[in-house]
Amino acid sequence: MAAKPKLYYFNGRGRMESIRWLLAAAGVEFEEEFLETREQYEKMQKDGHLLFGQVPLVEIDGMMLTQTRAILSYLAAKYNLYGKDLKERVRIDMYADGTQDLMMMIAVAPFKTPKEKEESYDLILSRAKTRYFPVFEKILKDHGEAFLVGNQLSWADIQLLEAILMVEELSAPVLSDFPLLQAFKTRISNIPTIKKFLQPGSQRKPPPDGPYVEVVRTVLKF
């Protein structure tokens, strides 16, 4: 029996959360080792596991993988969440990159000053409602299918749901003008593996709080 993938990262969302989502949606069990001290981080660097000196790090299939985008692409292809051909794959890439841009705006906000954080959240909500969500509402309207690409679950769907839920944590009614996205959210959330991941007690991480921010600052020295 193959070993479970092992994820090395902080005990929080950051750049690892989309990886957790993808594995969970694929029904893949995984282990986690949480980065809590500077010494752990320096040992990982010394051991040569961090290609560019950065986490996340994922141990899978005899490999130590770094760089979030590369990890997500590998997992999507491995678990049949990456479309049926190159044309579907590039659309999945475009949609996933778009939602990743939105989610990274949210991920970095807790590390800002209170004033900057408030301004960031206002900008995030504005961008979500005027730049990102209208695009996905139109995609769903134009093809009339249940999923974003190829009428089957893909990385793009999983990451869009992740992004929607993150933005809803800032403003619960953010989807009020997007009925197709509301239906999409309900539909994808009810896929059994995803529904399980959304339940309390799963490996899904909560929004970043003060202690999480301090651990990241201490370990990475910024």
Swiss-Prot record:
On the basis of immunological and kinetics data, GST 5.7 is distinct from alpha, mu and pI classes of GTS. However it has been postulated that this protein may be part of a distinct subgroup within this alpha class. The variations were found from AA sequencing and imply there are multiple forms of this protein. These variations are likely to be sex-linked and tissue specific. Conjugation of reduced glutathione to a wide number of exogenous and endogenous hydrophobic electrophiles. This is Glutathione S-transferase A4. One of its GO terms (molecular function) is glutathione transferase activity. The N-terminus is blocked. Changing K115P: Requires 2 nucleotide substitutions. The gene is Gsta4. One of its GO terms (cellular component) is mitochondrion. Its main location: cytoplasm. InterPro entries: Glutathione-S-Trfase_C-like, Glutathione-S-Trfase_C_sf, Glutathione_S-Trfase, Glutathione_S-Trfase_N, GST_alpha, GST_C, GST_superfamily, Thioredoxin-like_sf. The keyword Ribosomal protein does not apply. It comes from the Eukaryota. It catalyses: RX + glutathione = an S-substituted glutathione + a halide anion + H(+). Belongs to the GST superfamily. Alpha family. Homodimer. Residues 3-83 form the GST N-terminal domain. Its EC number is 2.5.1.18. The modification N-acetylmethionine is found at M1. Signal peptide: none annotated. Keywords: Acetylation, Cytoplasm, Transferase. The keyword Transmembrane helix does not apply. GO terms for biological process: glutathione metabolic process; response to caloric restriction. Disulfide bonds: none annotated.
